[in-house]
Amino acid sequence: MAPVLSKDVADIESILALNPRTQSRATLRSTLAKKLDKKHWKRNPDKNCFNCEKLENNFDDIKHTTLGERGALREAMRCLKCADAPCQKSCPTNLDIKSFITSISNKNYYGAAKMIFSDNPLGLTCGMVCPTSDLCVGGCNLYATEEGPINIGGLQQYATEVFKAMNIPQIRNPSLPPPEKMPEAYSAKIALLGAGPASISCASFLARLGYNDITIFEKQEYVGGISTSEIPQFRLPYDVVNFEIELMKDLGVKIICGKSLSVNDITLSTLKEEGYKAAFIGIGLPEPKKDHIFQGLTQDQGFYTSKDFLPLVAKSSKAGMCACHSPLLSIRGTVIVLGAGDTAFDCATSALRCGARRVFIVFRKGFVNIRAVPEEVELAREEKCEFLPFLSPRKVIVKGGRIVAMQFVRTEQDETGKWNEDGDQIACLKADVVISAFGSVLSDPKVKEALSPIKFNRWDLPEVDPETMQTSEPWVFAGGDVVGIANTTVEAVNDGKQASWYIHRYIQSQYGASVSAKPELPLFYTPIDLVDISVEMAALKFTNPFGLASATPTTSSSMIRRAFEAGWAFALTKTFSLDKDIVTNVSPRIIRGTTSGPMYGPGQSSFLNIELISEKTAAYWCQSVTELKADFPDNIVIASIMCSYNRNDWMELSRKAEASGADALELNLSCPHGMGERGMGLACGQDPELVRNICRWVRQAVRIPFFAKLTPNVTDIVSIARAAKEGGANGVTATNTVSGLMGLKADGTPWPAVGREKRTTYGGVSGTAIRPIALRAVTTIARALPEFPILATGGIDSAESGLQFLHGGASVLQVCSAIQNQDFTIIQDYCTGLKALLYLKSIEELQDWDGQSPATKSHQKGKPVPCIAELVGKKLPSFGPYLEKCKKIIAEEKLRLKKENVTVLPLERNHFIPKKPIPSVKDVIGKALQYLGTYGELNNTEQVVAVIDEEMCINCGKCYMTCNDSGYQAIQFDPETHLPTVTDTCTGCTLCLSVCPIIDCIKMVSRTTPYEPKRGLPLAVNPVS
């Protein structure tokens, strides 16, 4: 009996065991069985913790906000990039959050980092530790939606971490003269006391302004202030602090350690005697607040203040902080942490990593009065710290020279809001260690004396003007904790930033110079910003390759003016005609596309329009061109014109446009709707003969360059481009919109629907949805007509996508839909993005990057995955019993590492230097053409197969399902672990990679065995006749 070919064989049936099937009946399974099922597949922590995760010596990142590239891109795309963004108003350093998230969504991580560091020199630190829920995130407009606010801190951290990996130095503002040619005032000696966030920020901005004799004095042998000594490694790694300090040192700032503010060392008086013209005090609050009940208690007895405890933990957990290796502080038994601020929660979670069995966080007020940010509170709760509110410490009980317990009294709030202690309600809590985290003060008399003669306020802190950060001594400024205004790292950074401008103003005044009334601090610069992205085309010089397409962004000339002011290099006017062909538009006429699915807001992948050409007259546009060229001589203005197939009309209109001063013309031969019915636009652009003749007419009429705008709504676009070239065109624009019908509602009516009759017509589809069509048009023209200029348009929404068109043979790039999604300011992102892409091509150490995307390392939730397979010989999924086993293995490994005596060398930062010439825009034009050809030129003997990274796999089975129902049934799916395995029947089709939700979890690698296609039945052998 012949086999049944249309039935799966037994081996395939086995593979298909877990493949989805349509449901035909209800499913029955007992509650007990479901409880067991739930336990097996559970990924989040069990609320009944009988055997909590062991965290001793585990200083791995625990932040919920941390993102990998996938998470960062999705979150950035979700951001609305609002007008007058409230998030920015809530950021102490005034970060342009809208702009840096725009850059992240466009995979321009350098552009994002540049925006961040321009306003915050400690942008990576703040991305990690900022209490964003109380700052920028608190103002996010998406709080008004179901999905909630944007993870701004995580995005900030991701972008700046990618820049950190680029290993590129900060440079002086390129517009400044060399240091030796700067005015004398910029050589003034400036001293900063304390190497914490406020001083690093202040010194960075002063150096960016051009000052070249800046010294920071730090009393410790390490730098970074509390970022180094008190914020734990699992929240803020030391290499991050060191990186930002190195960026500051790139500008020539000097740091001298082991020098303290004290009558026995440095004083304001000695600084003045040594010739310092200005000083900044950023020493923080170095002494702990200590309740009288702790007098006489020592660390040997089990008592620590946060100022004792956290630095001890830091020295043993922060690699590179100091050359010596300090063993991790060992704590056993029960720990009581007193306080409800961020520091108290840092102490609690750090105590667990020092070996504490249980940690109680005890505070005087209730949960609603906890001062710590929600992020810290949630982390402590997840790590099973216990919270005890409404208790005030009364007494420490010591036996045998060790703390054994603490006595508390109950606190209550009366009707007036005053908190009182109730001595009748006493609680006693057994404990082995007590950590007091009641805050910090400035109490050392030697330090205060060293600050003489500045005045102190009623809180015994230096008195400063909160606007200028100036003390009672005009040459002395202060910021950060020591002033008592800043409560967070980011606020301390802003104090230093604020002070830098007024130090600048003060110093300049001492040298008889003045500064602008409005503060103007320089941006952050690197060698990337020096990359030249200008390009020449048809004897026209473009400052960058990005311009406005003849479309909605050029509805009026005033809009073009604003675009030029923003940085766009060129613009095409909205297409205009002779007055006899003037149009009136219908409405509605521009709608969102359906190609993005149910995604609302910006980031649309397509738009459809049934808008005609400009409703404004030729006279308006000609005068506008004249005005724009007068005010923006370095910008290119291209007049976009349209006529019917009439020689006289084309010659008349093109001469008018040339006379207006336009640099070039674009002949719109491609409008896909409306105009074609008038014998214009598409009606002219689909016939090579008509195109050739129109171009000949225009060539006879004008001397300036002109370009024919082509339609993609043809069978052979090359024949149209060739006709334009033969007619004398200097190049072509490829392509205009694709004719389409975007959608029909459930009742059958279209959208857009015009008038009472709800009628519509086929419109022009634009946006990233048509990019494949536009790329094909550009590359086919470039291959057929080498060196023939192409103005690309069609889905260009980033520097990365723009580079694709340049590689495809385009010379300059026109943008429309991306502006409809956002605004004119995206040009800043495009320029920095293209500069970065070109610069990184010259760095040999980054050749495994894809543009600005680093090579993907195995990770889960954006955090590195421990190599479990190396420890136990096999890979395990991250859920249920396997996750618990992973945690146990990691805990054992951390304990093993704790016992090793590891010597850590100081961190060194050696910048990546370009080993190859940085390519120009001209150098990359057409680079991809060598890879394009016919199907017959492809090699079918060099095959690939899929390989799945099981450590990154999230076990969704998408690869398995698409392979089953759309491919070759070549992936097995384990019923217990849900780990997919690619079999040797893989054909390398790449569908699995295409639907995988995790970047680089699946990779295609070269096949090592010969590929033998499955023919179903053997090939018939026909005899030779």
UniProtKB/Swiss-Prot annotation:
Binds 2 FAD. [4Fe-4S] cluster 4 binds at residues 986, 989, 992, 996. Residues 69-100, 944-976, 978-1007 form the 4Fe-4S ferredoxin-type domain. GO terms for cellular component: cytoplasm; cytosol. Its main location: cytoplasm. FAD binds at residues 129, 194-198, 218-226, 235, 261, 480-489. NADP(+) binds at residues 340-343, 364-365, 371, 437-439, 481-487. Inactivated by 5-iodouracil. Belongs to the dihydropyrimidine dehydrogenase family. Involved in pyrimidine base degradation. Catalyzes the reduction of uracil and thymine. Also involved the degradation of the chemotherapeutic drug 5-fluorouracil. Homodimer. This is Dihydropyrimidine dehydrogenase [NADP(+)].
